[in-house]
């Protein structure tokens, strides 16, 4: 595959890094991680990790792309590091919207200065931030997402997710990120296209306790559809694996629903019920968590329902919301 990046070098890892020490031991100085360390975001010396999943208060933490945007425009990160290492190694695990947008910001840092006032680019960066902070359950106007080219820009990721991980995963991830970057360049140059939202998520279970279990059918736009329908607390089946295991997300749409939809308690209970309880399968932040995207969960959605119902019922009772 020809190299389509010059400022950065995308490095797709075979595993996520366990913590900061693991990352620093494993990669060269002047390296950047994008949602690839099971640890807090930030920087340590000449190592940076843009993330908003582990060890954070979700609603008080920017998306990885917004962190990268500020680091490039205000912090002059790329300008400062390029004299020491070029290309700059950027470690990734997947090619979701936040990672793709972060990679574009790092690779095309010079374009940010030229087009920083571009309303559509600014809108996409800001709207990605809102959606990601809320785990995809931000109340949206679906037509606005289509009209402002958000769905078109990230269509390559949607296609990759719909088809699942293929052989040659690293090439698939790099190609997906490159395609999204190409579309962002087209956006800046007035050549953006249009992609309608066609996701039809299935509600598998609607709890009297105010949460739903939904099957995304492999389409990342499903969560936007669910948010537009007014769902706020969600256990989401992302995919069924060929191994028979599952990938889930657990999302609380409002930080103020902690007393009635306790994500941390739910995740701890799901972890305890796994077939490999000593392997860390479930984790995340206070508002959005899920099962490990590498190993997957052994629990089907009916088992999650049976575990979640008494926890949510008790939480609502203690909060005085059991009758609502």
Question: What are these model-derived regions, one by one?
Answer:
Residues 1-59:
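Short, surface-exposed loop/strand segments
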Residues 2, 21-30, 41-46, 178-324:
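Gly/His-enriched, cation/cofactor- and phosphate-binding structural elements
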Residues 5-11, 29-34, 82-94, 211-215:
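Short hydrophobic beta-strand segments
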Residues 34-35, 91, 104, 249-251, ...:
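Residues in well-ordered beta-strands of folded domains
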Residues 51, 90-92, 283:
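Divalent metal-coordination and catalytic microenvironments
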Residues 58-151:
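Active-site histidine-anchored catalytic micro-motif
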Residues 131-195:
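Long, charge-rich alpha-helical interaction segments
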